[in-house]
Protein backbone atom coordinates (compact mmCIF):
# COMPACT_ATOMS: atom_id res chain seq x y z
CA UNK A 1 0.00 0.00 0.00
CA UNK A 2 1.14 3.48 -0.75
CA UNK A 3 1.87 5.93 2.05
CA UNK A 4 -0.77 8.50 2.91
CA UNK A 5 -0.10 11.75 1.13
CA UNK A 6 -0.91 15.17 2.57
CA UNK A 7 -3.21 17.53 0.77
CA UNK A 8 -1.53 20.61 -0.65
CA UNK A 9 2.05 21.76 -0.80
CA UNK A 10 4.11 21.24 2.37
CA UNK A 11 6.32 24.22 1.51
CA UNK A 12 3.44 26.70 1.42
CA UNK A 13 4.21 28.07 4.89
CA UNK A 14 7.82 28.80 3.93
CA UNK A 15 6.80 30.91 0.98
CA UNK A 16 7.68 34.57 1.48
CA UNK A 17 5.36 37.40 0.61
CA UNK A 18 6.88 39.57 -2.12
CA UNK A 19 7.77 43.08 -0.94
CA UNK A 20 7.35 46.22 -2.97
CA UNK A 21 9.98 48.90 -2.40
CA UNK A 22 7.43 51.56 -3.23
CA UNK A 23 5.50 50.87 -0.02
CA UNK A 24 8.33 49.97 2.36
CA UNK A 25 8.11 53.32 4.21
CA UNK A 26 4.37 52.91 4.94
CA UNK A 27 3.68 51.74 8.50
CA UNK A 28 0.69 49.93 9.94
CA UNK A 29 -2.10 51.87 11.60
CA UNK A 30 -2.12 49.73 14.74
CA UNK A 31 1.11 50.61 16.55
CA UNK A 32 0.54 50.10 20.29
CA UNK A 33 2.38 48.11 22.91
CA UNK A 34 5.73 46.37 22.66
CA UNK A 35 6.48 44.40 19.53
CA UNK A 36 9.41 42.92 17.69
CA UNK A 37 9.02 45.58 15.00
CA UNK A 38 9.51 48.38 17.50
CA UNK A 39 12.47 46.60 19.05
CA UNK A 40 14.17 46.17 15.69
CA UNK A 41 13.47 49.81 14.81
CA UNK A 42 15.06 50.91 18.07
CA UNK A 43 18.14 48.79 17.40
CA UNK A 44 18.42 50.16 13.87
CA UNK A 45 18.08 53.72 15.20
CA UNK A 46 20.91 53.13 17.66
CA UNK A 47 23.15 51.67 14.97
CA UNK A 48 22.32 54.47 12.55
CA UNK A 49 22.63 57.50 14.86
CA UNK A 50 24.91 56.42 17.71
CA UNK A 51 28.35 54.85 17.98
CA UNK A 52 28.46 53.13 21.34
CA UNK A 53 31.74 51.48 22.27
CA UNK A 54 32.80 49.35 25.18
CA UNK A 55 34.81 50.95 28.00
CA UNK A 56 34.13 54.56 27.02
CA UNK A 57 36.10 56.96 29.21
CA UNK A 58 33.69 59.84 28.73
CA UNK A 59 30.07 60.23 29.77
CA UNK A 60 27.15 61.00 27.48
CA UNK A 61 24.32 63.51 27.59
CA UNK A 62 21.14 63.07 25.58
CA UNK A 63 19.87 65.71 23.19
CA UNK A 64 16.61 66.00 25.13
CA UNK A 65 18.50 66.50 28.39
CA UNK A 66 20.63 69.19 26.77
CA UNK A 67 17.48 70.93 25.50
CA UNK A 68 16.05 70.96 29.04
CA UNK A 69 19.33 72.38 30.31
CA UNK A 70 19.20 75.16 27.71
CA UNK A 71 15.65 76.10 28.70
CA UNK A 72 16.50 76.20 32.39
CA UNK A 73 19.66 78.27 31.89
CA UNK A 74 17.80 80.76 29.72
CA UNK A 75 15.02 81.01 32.32
CA UNK A 76 17.46 81.61 35.19
CA UNK A 77 19.38 84.20 33.17
CA UNK A 78 16.18 86.03 32.29
CA UNK A 79 15.10 86.14 35.93
CA UNK A 80 18.54 87.29 37.02
CA UNK A 81 18.82 90.07 34.46
CA UNK A 82 15.29 91.30 35.13
CA UNK A 83 16.16 91.68 38.82
CA UNK A 84 13.41 89.38 40.10
CA UNK A 85 15.86 86.84 41.54
CA UNK A 86 17.78 87.91 44.64
CA UNK A 87 21.25 86.86 45.70
CA UNK A 88 19.89 84.67 48.51
CA UNK A 89 17.70 82.75 46.07
CA UNK A 90 20.65 82.15 43.75
CA UNK A 91 22.69 80.88 46.70
CA UNK A 92 19.90 78.47 47.66
CA UNK A 93 19.78 77.19 44.07
CA UNK A 94 23.50 76.44 44.15
CA UNK A 95 23.28 74.76 47.57
CA UNK A 96 20.29 72.54 46.72
CA UNK A 97 20.98 71.69 43.08
CA UNK A 98 22.78 68.38 43.63
CA UNK A 99 21.07 65.43 41.93
CA UNK A 100 23.47 62.50 42.31
CA UNK A 101 24.83 61.24 45.60
CA UNK A 102 28.51 60.86 46.44
CA UNK A 103 28.52 57.12 45.72
CA UNK A 104 26.84 57.55 42.34
CA UNK A 105 29.20 60.36 41.43
CA UNK A 106 32.19 58.15 42.26
CA UNK A 107 30.94 55.37 40.01
CA UNK A 108 30.20 57.79 37.17
CA UNK A 109 33.73 59.16 37.09
CA UNK A 110 35.71 58.00 34.07
CA UNK A 111 38.70 56.58 35.92
CA UNK A 112 37.05 55.76 39.26
CA UNK A 113 39.63 57.70 41.30
CA UNK A 114 39.04 59.49 44.56
CA UNK A 115 36.71 58.73 47.43
CA UNK A 116 33.27 60.01 48.43
CA UNK A 117 34.77 61.72 51.44
CA UNK A 118 37.10 64.09 49.65
CA UNK A 119 35.27 64.62 46.36
CA UNK A 120 32.65 67.35 45.98
CA UNK A 121 29.45 66.74 44.08
CA UNK A 122 28.85 68.39 40.75
CA UNK A 123 25.30 69.74 40.56
CA UNK A 124 24.94 68.67 36.97
CA UNK A 125 25.53 65.01 36.18
CA UNK A 126 23.68 63.48 33.26
CA UNK A 127 24.27 59.96 32.08
CA UNK A 128 22.84 58.71 28.83
CA UNK A 129 20.93 55.44 29.21
CA UNK A 130 19.99 52.83 26.69
CA UNK A 131 16.38 52.86 27.92
CA UNK A 132 15.13 56.30 27.00
CA UNK A 133 11.60 55.75 28.35
CA UNK A 134 12.75 55.04 31.89
CA UNK A 135 15.34 57.82 31.86
CA UNK A 136 12.69 60.47 31.32
CA UNK A 137 11.11 59.74 34.70
CA UNK A 138 14.34 59.61 36.70
CA UNK A 139 15.92 62.43 38.65
CA UNK A 140 19.08 62.35 36.55
CA UNK A 141 17.43 63.74 33.46
CA UNK A 142 14.87 65.93 35.27
CA UNK A 143 16.51 69.33 35.31
CA UNK A 144 13.77 70.78 37.52
CA UNK A 145 15.68 69.50 40.55
CA UNK A 146 18.98 70.79 39.18
CA UNK A 147 17.84 74.38 38.83
CA UNK A 148 14.88 74.62 41.23
CA UNK A 149 16.51 72.82 44.16
CA UNK A 150 14.02 71.51 46.70
CA UNK A 151 11.28 73.99 45.94
CA UNK A 152 12.44 77.36 47.23
CA UNK A 153 12.08 78.86 43.76
CA UNK A 154 9.86 77.20 41.17
CA UNK A 155 11.08 78.02 37.69
CA UNK A 156 9.58 74.96 36.01
CA UNK A 157 6.16 76.50 35.44
CA UNK A 158 6.72 77.96 32.02
CA UNK A 159 3.11 79.09 31.76
CA UNK A 160 3.55 81.64 34.55
CA UNK A 161 6.56 83.25 32.90
CA UNK A 162 5.51 86.09 30.65
CA UNK A 163 7.35 86.05 27.39
CA UNK A 164 8.66 89.48 26.59
CA UNK A 165 9.51 90.97 23.23
CA UNK A 166 12.41 89.80 21.12
CA UNK A 167 15.80 90.66 22.61
CA UNK A 168 18.01 93.07 20.81
CA UNK A 169 20.93 91.99 18.67
CA UNK A 170 23.39 93.28 21.26
CA UNK A 171 21.83 91.00 23.90
CA UNK A 172 22.21 87.94 21.63
CA UNK A 173 25.89 88.72 21.07
CA UNK A 174 26.74 88.20 24.73
CA UNK A 175 27.14 84.67 26.14
CA UNK A 176 25.17 83.62 29.20
CA UNK A 177 26.71 84.88 32.41
CA UNK A 178 27.89 82.09 34.74
CA UNK A 179 26.70 79.42 32.30
CA UNK A 180 26.99 75.95 33.89
CA UNK A 181 28.16 74.31 30.65
CA UNK A 182 30.79 74.99 28.01
CA UNK A 183 29.73 73.77 24.56
CA UNK A 184 32.56 72.92 22.16
CA UNK A 185 32.24 72.14 18.45
CA UNK A 186 35.19 69.89 17.57
CA UNK A 187 34.72 70.13 13.78
CA UNK A 188 36.76 72.32 11.46
CA UNK A 189 36.07 76.02 11.00
CA UNK A 190 34.23 75.70 7.68
CA UNK A 191 31.73 73.21 9.10
CA UNK A 192 31.28 75.41 12.15
CA UNK A 193 30.51 78.45 10.00
CA UNK A 194 27.90 76.48 8.05
CA UNK A 195 25.94 75.17 11.05
CA UNK A 196 26.45 74.95 14.80
CA UNK A 197 24.51 75.02 18.05
CA UNK A 198 23.79 78.48 19.39
CA UNK A 199 26.40 79.41 21.99
CA UNK A 200 28.95 76.78 20.91
CA UNK A 201 32.64 77.63 20.58
CA UNK A 202 34.76 76.21 17.81
CA UNK A 203 37.53 73.94 19.08
CA UNK A 204 38.90 71.75 16.26
CA UNK A 205 40.24 68.37 17.27
CA UNK A 206 43.59 69.34 15.73
CA UNK A 207 44.12 71.66 18.71
CA UNK A 208 44.69 68.59 20.89
CA UNK A 209 47.80 67.75 18.86
CA UNK A 210 49.60 70.90 19.94
CA UNK A 211 52.54 70.49 22.27
CA UNK A 212 52.15 73.98 23.76
CA UNK A 213 48.87 75.47 25.02
CA UNK A 214 46.43 72.96 23.51
CA UNK A 215 43.52 74.28 25.61
CA UNK A 216 41.86 77.68 25.44
CA UNK A 217 41.35 79.86 28.54
CA UNK A 218 37.64 78.98 28.58
CA UNK A 219 38.42 75.25 28.70
CA UNK A 220 40.91 75.73 31.52
CA UNK A 221 38.31 77.76 33.42
CA UNK A 222 35.70 75.00 33.16
CA UNK A 223 38.10 72.10 33.67
CA UNK A 224 36.96 70.08 36.72
CA UNK A 225 35.26 73.21 38.11
CA UNK A 226 32.54 72.76 40.71
CA UNK A 227 29.08 73.03 39.19
CA UNK A 228 30.30 73.23 35.58
CA UNK A 229 30.54 70.72 32.74
CA UNK A 230 32.10 70.61 29.26
CA UNK A 231 30.06 69.22 26.36
CA UNK A 232 31.58 68.13 23.03
CA UNK A 233 29.66 67.46 19.84
CA UNK A 234 30.10 66.96 16.10
CA UNK A 235 27.94 65.61 13.29
CA UNK A 236 27.87 61.85 13.95
CA UNK A 237 30.17 61.12 16.94
CA UNK A 238 33.14 60.25 14.73
CA UNK A 239 35.34 63.14 15.82
CA UNK A 240 33.74 63.97 19.16
CA UNK A 241 34.35 60.50 20.60
CA UNK A 242 38.07 60.74 19.80
CA UNK A 243 38.34 64.23 21.28
CA UNK A 244 36.41 63.23 24.40
CA UNK A 245 38.60 60.16 24.98
CA UNK A 246 41.77 62.23 24.59
CA UNK A 247 40.60 64.93 26.99
CA UNK A 248 39.51 62.35 29.57
CA UNK A 249 42.95 60.76 29.37
CA UNK A 250 44.41 64.19 30.14
CA UNK A 251 42.48 64.59 33.36
CA UNK A 252 39.07 66.02 32.41
CA UNK A 253 36.47 64.49 34.74
CA UNK A 254 33.49 66.77 34.01
CA UNK A 255 33.44 66.02 30.28
CA UNK A 256 30.34 64.89 28.38
CA UNK A 257 29.65 64.07 24.75
CA UNK A 258 26.34 64.97 23.10
CA UNK A 259 24.89 61.66 21.93
CA UNK A 260 24.08 61.63 18.23
CA UNK A 261 25.43 65.12 17.56
CA UNK A 262 23.87 67.28 14.86
CA UNK A 263 22.41 64.20 13.17
CA UNK A 264 20.00 63.53 16.03
CA UNK A 265 19.36 67.25 16.53
CA UNK A 266 18.23 67.57 12.91
CA UNK A 267 15.67 64.80 13.53
CA UNK A 268 14.29 65.85 16.92
CA UNK A 269 15.02 69.60 17.05
CA UNK A 270 15.12 70.81 13.44
CA UNK A 271 14.59 74.42 14.56
CA UNK A 272 15.64 76.40 17.59
CA UNK A 273 18.83 74.76 18.84
CA UNK A 274 21.05 75.47 15.84
CA UNK A 275 21.82 78.33 13.50
CA UNK A 276 22.58 77.90 9.81
CA UNK A 277 21.81 74.99 7.48
CA UNK A 278 22.35 71.38 8.53
CA UNK A 279 24.98 69.40 6.59
CA UNK A 280 23.72 66.99 3.97
CA UNK A 281 25.06 64.04 5.97
CA UNK A 282 22.77 64.94 8.88
CA UNK A 283 19.57 65.11 6.84
CA UNK A 284 17.37 62.05 6.43
CA UNK A 285 17.16 60.60 2.89
CA UNK A 286 13.89 61.51 1.12
CA UNK A 287 11.28 58.83 0.48
CA UNK A 288 9.82 60.41 -2.66
CA UNK A 289 9.96 59.04 -6.18
CA UNK A 290 12.57 60.05 -8.72
CA UNK A 291 10.17 62.26 -10.67
CA UNK A 292 9.20 64.15 -7.51
CA UNK A 293 12.84 64.62 -6.58
CA UNK A 294 13.56 66.22 -9.93
CA UNK A 295 10.76 68.74 -9.50
CA UNK A 296 11.58 69.78 -5.91
CA UNK A 297 14.25 72.52 -5.77
CA UNK A 298 17.07 72.31 -3.25
CA UNK A 299 16.95 74.57 -0.22
CA UNK A 300 19.54 77.36 -0.26
CA UNK A 301 22.42 77.02 2.18
CA UNK A 302 22.15 79.67 4.90
CA UNK A 303 25.37 80.45 6.80
CA UNK A 304 25.31 80.35 10.58
CA UNK A 305 24.73 83.54 12.53
CA UNK A 306 27.16 84.77 15.15
CA UNK A 307 24.87 84.74 18.17
CA UNK A 308 25.56 83.40 21.65
CA UNK A 309 22.06 83.37 23.14
CA UNK A 310 18.73 81.86 22.21
CA UNK A 311 15.95 84.27 21.28
CA UNK A 312 12.42 83.91 22.63
CA UNK A 313 11.33 82.33 19.33
CA UNK A 314 14.15 79.79 19.55
CA UNK A 315 13.21 78.87 23.12
CA UNK A 316 9.56 78.47 22.13
CA UNK A 317 10.45 76.13 19.26
CA UNK A 318 12.79 74.12 21.51
CA UNK A 319 10.03 73.74 24.09
CA UNK A 320 7.52 72.60 21.46
CA UNK A 321 9.90 70.02 19.96
CA UNK A 322 10.82 68.79 23.45
CA UNK A 323 7.17 68.23 24.35
CA UNK A 324 6.63 66.26 21.14
CA UNK A 325 9.65 64.04 21.81
CA UNK A 326 8.70 63.36 25.42
CA UNK A 327 5.07 62.66 24.50
CA UNK A 328 6.07 60.19 21.78
CA UNK A 329 8.41 58.29 24.09
CA UNK A 330 5.97 58.16 27.02
CA UNK A 331 2.91 57.07 24.99
CA UNK A 332 3.49 53.25 25.30
CA UNK A 333 3.90 53.46 29.07
CA UNK A 334 0.70 55.49 29.41
CA UNK A 335 -1.19 53.00 27.25
CA UNK A 336 -0.02 50.13 29.45
CA UNK A 337 -1.16 52.01 32.56
CA UNK A 338 -4.56 52.71 30.99
CA UNK A 339 -4.97 49.03 30.08
CA UNK A 340 -4.17 48.00 33.65
CA UNK A 341 -6.64 50.52 35.06
CA UNK A 342 -9.35 49.33 32.67
CA UNK A 343 -8.89 45.72 33.82
CA UNK A 344 -9.25 46.50 37.52
CA UNK A 345 -12.97 47.56 37.52
CA UNK A 346 -14.07 44.43 35.62
CA UNK A 347 -12.25 42.17 38.05
CA UNK A 348 -13.62 44.07 41.03
CA UNK A 349 -17.19 43.87 39.70
CA UNK A 350 -16.92 40.11 39.21
CA UNK A 351 -15.65 39.71 42.76
CA UNK A 352 -18.51 41.81 44.12
CA UNK A 353 -21.08 39.75 42.20
CA UNK A 354 -19.74 36.50 43.66
CA UNK A 355 -19.85 37.79 47.24
CA UNK A 356 -23.15 39.69 46.98
CA UNK A 357 -24.82 37.41 49.54
CA UNK A 358 -22.59 38.62 52.35
CA UNK A 359 -23.14 42.06 53.89
CA UNK A 360 -19.49 43.05 53.62
CA UNK A 361 -17.58 41.68 50.66
CA UNK A 362 -13.89 40.94 50.94
CA UNK A 363 -11.47 43.10 48.88
CA UNK A 364 -10.36 41.70 45.56
CA UNK A 365 -6.82 40.35 45.41
Swiss-Prot record:
Coiled-coil positions: none
Organism in which the protein naturally occurs: Xenopus laevis
Subcellular location: Cytoplasm, Cytoskeleton, Microtubule organizing center, Centrosome; Cell projection, Cilium; Cytoplasm, Cytoskeleton, Cilium basal body
Record key words, sorted: Cell projection, Ciliopathy, Cilium, Cilium biogenesis/degradation, Cytoplasm, Cytoskeleton, Protein transport, Transport
Function in brief: Required during ciliogenesis for tubulin glutamylation in cilium. Probably acts by participating in the transport of tubulin polyglutamylases between the basal body and the cilium.
Domain of life: Eukaryota
GO biological process: cilium assembly; protein polyglutamylation; protein transport
Family: Belongs to the CEP41 family.
Compositional bias per record (Low complexity), positions renumbered to this chain: 342-365
Domain Rhodanese: 177-274
Gene Ontology cellular component list: centriole; centrosome; ciliary basal body; cilium; cytoplasm
Matching PANTHER family: CENTROSOMAL PROTEIN OF 41 KDA
UniProt-annotated stretches for the region Disordered: 104-125, 329-365
Pfam families listed in its UniProt record: Rhodanese
Name this protein carries in UniProt: Centrosomal protein of 41 kDa A
Amino acid sequence: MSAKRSIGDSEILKKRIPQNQKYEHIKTRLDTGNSMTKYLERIEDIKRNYRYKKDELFKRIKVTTFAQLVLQVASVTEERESGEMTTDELQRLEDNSSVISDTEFLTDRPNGKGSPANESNSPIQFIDSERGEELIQTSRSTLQSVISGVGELDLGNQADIKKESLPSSSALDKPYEDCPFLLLDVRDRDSYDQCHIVGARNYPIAMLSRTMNPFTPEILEYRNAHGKIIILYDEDERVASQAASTMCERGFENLFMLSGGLKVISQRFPQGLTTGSFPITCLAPPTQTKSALKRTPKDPIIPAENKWRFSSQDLEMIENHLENVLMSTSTPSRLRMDSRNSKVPSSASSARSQSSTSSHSKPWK
